[in-house]
Amino acid sequence: MSAEGKAGRPVVIGAYGTGRKPCIQAPDSSLYTVLVRNSDYLTLENLEVVNTGKQRMANRTGVKVLCEDYGVSHDIVLRALHIHDVNGSLIKQKGGGSGILIVNRGKDTPSTFDGLRVEDCVIRRCERNGIIWSGYSNREHWHPNTRTVIRKNLIEEVPGDGIVPIGCDGALIEYNLMRNCPGTLPHSEAAAGLWPWSCDNTVIQFNEVSDHKAPWDAQGFDSDYNCRNTTIQYNYSHDNDGGLVLICNSGTDPGAGNQGSVVQYNVSINDAIRPRATRSGIFSANIHIAGPCKNTLVKRNLLHVNPKTEPFIDRSIITSDAWDGYADSTVFRENVFFVPQESEIRLNRSTRNTFDGNYYLGNIKGRPEDPNGRNVSDYYNRCISKDPSGFNSLSFLFDTVVIGDGSAILKAVNRDTIHRFFETMKEE
């Protein structure tokens, strides 16, 4: 479909009246169920979308939004869609598959989205990914999408990447829940929850990611390469095979690198629990910095580690390692690292790391010089005294928010409460 509405008077395509959402089901060999192409001021809402083939097919998706040789596509809105059972490829290099695929390109006319929104959708049992883009990534010909908002969506039973904006400037990813990820990806595959690629000024906040089981990575959040000024804040990560966050840069990529990432006021409980070897051996650091990332700030995050279920599971709180280079000028400030078992910080050959005022609550090997660091906190001990796992005892840090179709509850970090928590930690 293609349609051109006007600002304030969009073309609306969706259900009306009462009853169940109308269901659109693709033919067996279709790459998409719904295609929105070269449109302006269009809203697609209140529909059920299915694309299940007899066999898996690479690049299969539920809803595809395309802007091609069109210029600027304004205010496309996907709202309250239930997209499910899309059996794409599980392998990224073969094309993968997704619930929603957003594509902007143009041989003759650079084409972008301005004001695209995806909100209140449910994406369930879609393979490989949830919401993913294909946009301009080459910095020499970078035409970013603007005013992108992805808000209050439920992504569940999706094994791969949850939400991945590509080629955007100023994307806002907030109040989304990714959970119940099946461990069905092949051993070669890497994936994580919410992360940008080839983007600037992305804000990822007030989201919750749990149960990620990708064979490699599997963090709740990721500040990826060819990105500048990514902010990951006020998020809740728990029960992921990987840790809270990956911050990475390929040292051989000619793009923008990874500059100015900020990771702050996030809560991680029982992450980094991978019970099997990755393609590089046993590994599941709570914070993983890979490659020559520059000027990263990791500030006031709460990492509450629970006992590992097997002795061979990785116990690294922080690992900074190589990806054709090492990180430089990373600051860790006033974070809480709670560990019930011996753990480790591995900085390897990364340079100019600064640790200032962090809390090392437990036996942590490789602790760096931190003149303002602390080894004990009576306040934190009181917080978790009735529930050492942290799940109930730290629940005061969260609000509950209804998202998706109204049946899912998101735990969103409360901004004021977590600020008070860290001030209390500092003042005791």
Where are each of the predicted segments found?
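Residue-level marker of regulatory loop/turn positions in helix-turn-helix DNA-binding domains and
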Residues: 36, 70, 92, 110, ...
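Short, solvent-exposed loop/turn elements at domain surfaces
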Residues: 21-23, 411
